């Protein structure tokens, strides 16, 4: 049954969802909105959330000793091992439940939050292990496309042409030249999983995917497009607008993969050119001022077009053909 936004707003108007005001994340940051969306649905479905936090913007800004913005059990571990940590928590829960030490009617949701640095790169091995072993954990990636907590270094998620401190736009190179990793396909390759993309500009799609992920009998993964206003150089009231542009330009297609079956969940009737997405952000300003800017933008447009067509093909050929 689809989640009703008005009902959610009324339900959580005065009810605690797990993260409170007073955290130190930047105004306009996509991460706390992501957390609130996920926690609201978990609570709405009757789950008690247990949270793991990889080192990163979200962790350092919500749990600076001796303060915390969390009102649910949470664990801060290292940069690279939140998936491994939550695998252990989920396994301990099952052991205690088998011994009768946890009531049968008590529902827990084990949720790991990590940024792109701790997911695409540093934590990829522990994430893969969690998926392969089949732990019932929801891993939520807030993807701000760089190591933003430490000052905007490039990551495996940083797109071509983005200006970062470790891959700056200069005379010889137009910023980062490598393509962004396709993390959802990497996760989906583990086969018996649920993996999806989400955008803050599409809350109903977001909520539906969180519900499906939490109720999935196995590991689940949600990649959320999470603008960083500080290093993307956008105004703090543009978070949702940038997120919407990402969807409308095919830069961030919305889809899900359930046990190998692809489904595109948003198909805009008309797409905007990817250049509109680039022009809306200061991190691409130097790229767009280069003499070869048109050539680079055209290449990126061709790439997102091809990727979109590939997604539609995968949706067609995997329809009704789950791995298991």
From Swiss-Prot:
Residues 155-166 have a biased composition (Low complexity). SUPFAM superfamilies: Thiamin diphosphate-binding fold (THDP-binding). It catalyses: 2 oxidized [2Fe-2S]-[ferredoxin] + pyruvate + CoA = 2 reduced [2Fe-2S]-[ferredoxin] + acetyl-CoA + CO2 + H(+). Binds 1 [4Fe-4S] cluster per subunit. Its EC number is 1.2.7.1. It is an enzyme of class 1 (oxidoreductase). The keyword Metal-binding applies. Residues 150-172 are annotated as: Disordered. It comes from the Bacteria. The keyword 4Fe-4S applies. Keywords: 4Fe-4S, Iron, Iron-sulfur, Metal-binding, Oxidoreductase. Its cofactor is [4Fe-4S] cluster. One of its GO terms (molecular function) is metal ion binding. [4Fe-4S] cluster binds at residues 26, 29, 57, 228. Heterotetramer of one alpha, one beta, one delta and one gamma chain. This is Pyruvate synthase subunit PorB. It comes from Thermotoga maritima (strain ATCC 43589 / DSM 3109 / JCM 10099 / NBRC 100826 / MSB8).
